[in-house]
Structure formats: C-alpha cells, structure tokens
Amino acid sequence: MVKGLEKFNELVESFANLPTIGKKTAIRLAYHLCINNQIDGMKLAHNIENAIRFIKPCEQCGALSENELCEICSDEERNKNILCIVESPKDILTLEESQSYNGLYFVLDELNEEKLEKLKQIILKLNISELIFALTHSINSDATIFFIEDKFKGLNLTFSKIAQGIPSGINLENVDLISLNKAMNFRTKI
C-alpha cells in the first residue's frame, strides 16, 4: 500500500474484501472512482448505503425485499400452489432471471426446527401442493431433501427436484462424472 494515501488504501481494501475482486481489480476500481469518475463514486456510495439500509429478507420466503413481503410473494399472478426450496436469496435471483418458474420460493439457508416450522406453516396457509427442491447437488442436499420429505409426508405434497445433467455448450470430456451419470440415468425420451 502507498503511504500517505490511507483513504485510498482503505477503499482498495474494501473492494478486495468483496467476492471475486482481487487486489489489481480493487486498485483499478478505487482509481476509477476517485480520479476518473467521482460522480459514479458518489452514486455508488449512495446506492450501497441505501441497499444496506432498505433491503432485508422477505418475512415469508426470505428473498431480498424492500418491504415486509417481496414482489414475488405479493404477486397475485404467481402460481401459489408450488413452492421452490432454495439455499439463498441469490438462487431466487438466478431462477427469476431464467424465467422458467412462476411459483413461490422459500429460502432454506439452514436446517433447523424454526425454519421447518415456518415452512410447514407456509405450506398449510397457502395450500401448497408441490415442493420443488432447487439445491446445489451434494450428499448434504440429498439428505436435506430426504429429511424434509419424511417430515412432511403427511401433508399430501408432491416432491420434486430440479433436473441435473450436462450444461448447454459443454463438451462431454469437460463434464464431471457425477453429472454425466445423472444425465444418462435421468435422460428424457424425444
């Protein structure tokens, strides 16, 4: 770090603490905002402050929201009979961007009795008929799915999980063996 530039060094350090930002990128960003475009720097500072102050988890599903209920939970056009279980609010952003799902969500960031009771209350209150698990493929997520399925087996629910397999545009030689195995075993007829 450069002596005598404590504020600049602190900004570089703050950027470098963010995911996927290395030191070189942090220096470029800090320089750009301090020297090349101070207006963008002020806007960024204002937007960060507002996001921290106003964005919170939706009280029902756990998605990012500026209100008690997020736009998804408040949307009357959504299919209120299906509930997609995800690991984080970021997963909701990804699924929404794909425009492949029109139901509700529930963020299961940790498996505990409080979360399970909240999930059960939502299922009963909204008369959910299907739980879709959109979790990262792992032994832990398989155990979580099995546990929830067993716990809620008396609620007349259909349980499903998102398909897994080979991503578009990837050569078979670059696919891990677990994904290739799943793709072969869960292939669809054409």
From Swiss-Prot:
InterPro entries documented for this protein: DNA_Rcmb_RecR, Rcmb_RecR, Rcmb_RecR_Znf, TOPRIM_dom, TOPRIM_RecR
Transmembrane segments: none
Zn finger limits (C4-type): 58-73
GO annotation terms (biological process): DNA recombination; DNA repair
GO molecular function, one term: DNA binding
Free-text function comment from the UniProt entry: May play a role in DNA repair. It seems to be involved in an RecBC-independent recombinational process of DNA repair. It may act with RecF and RecO.
PANTHER family to which the protein is assigned, alphabetical: RECOMBINATION PROTEIN RECR
Name this protein carries in UniProt: Recombination protein RecR
